[in-house]
């Protein structure tokens, strides 16, 4: 009888230990900041975007256009892993523009940043990396406009950019928001991004000398983006909001 009781007590202790370990792991996960990404091809990797139907440029299948073949080589995965963060949602779509005007003046409202900006979950940090395709596609610039946007306005870069930042500020409160500005874009796009970010008080990370192949970051370029983003955040850490949210969803 005593032997049975000892065995029973040991099982109870074992299960208690397992519960403690699980609780500790859950608490650790909840204390880690979560990151959501709103981007274009630079931030894609097949199988890691939400929704899964989003078009991807990078994948594990080797192709001559790039040397990036692992998600671990992407700028955003490096950034998350090296900072001890967790991925909330990567809502990136290859070829997408911020505004609703895409290549050949096509209607890109099915994939634009302003369409996808509502699907970022509940992160602690939002990284917006866009404007590249607006520049490459010669999307119309439009005027600087900070309210009262019309449907027509959202087919133009400047009002759409303002509309997007206005939305994320008001719908993702207590969240750190960064806009990452690519290299080699048209001056009008660069100046517009910086002016609109300044208007809303959004941190603009202006990249420098990123290594690319076929217009897209190489493995080296991905590392450069990660390092420049980390450096920017470190240098501006005193001004950042340190509040965290327990989980992504």
Predicted regions and their residues:
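N-terminal secretory targeting modules
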Residues: 1-71, 81-82, 119-121, 173, ...
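Conserved SGNH/GDSL esterase-like catalytic core that processes O-acyl groups on lipids
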Residues: 34, 48-142
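Alpha-helical cap/lid subdomain in secreted, periplasmic
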Residues: 107-249
